[in-house]
Amino acid sequence: MLFRSYKKNLIKFVTEVKTKGATPILVTPVSRRKFKKGVFSDSHGVYPEIVKEVAQKENTLLIDLQAKSADAISKQGDEKSKQWFNYVAAGTNPIVPDGKSDDTHFSETGAMKMASLVVEGVRELNLKGLVQNLKR
């Protein structure tokens, strides 16, 4: 049920953007950090595929951030990839005295890395009027 409304809403957004004369770009969800026995594992299920399907059906540009981020996180490995996420050791931060292990939300370093992957995707699409305005 949720999948259908997700797809329906994506199509609605794409249609509305095109109606206004703009160029929509769909982006698959960024990967969460999930390793099983040291091997990176996807945790988004069908959502990235729905985005790809809508992009194809609606003839819309796509940045596959799920694939790009999964590759980057996997290459970093189980331990080193933690620096990209909100990991706080117990006793090091008064706001979270017991520490925190968050494999969904990014640290500043991780957010910058994910943003660079989006920029990479925009460059690959080679959109005139957009690419030349990118700083990196």
Task: Please state what every model-predicted region is.
Residues 29-136:
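Catalytic His-Asp segment of secreted/periplasmic serine-dependent ester chemistry enzymes
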Residues 18-25, 57-61:
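Loop/turn elements at helix/coil->beta-strand transitions in domains of secreted/extracellular proteins
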Residues 12, 28-29:
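Short glycine/proline-centered loop/turn elements that form peptide/ligand docking sites
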Residues 8, 12-15, 19, 46-53:
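Alpha-helical scaffolding segments of alpha/beta enzyme cores, especially the outer helices
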Residues 6-9, 13, 114, 118:
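Alpha-helical packing segments of well-folded alpha/beta enzyme cores
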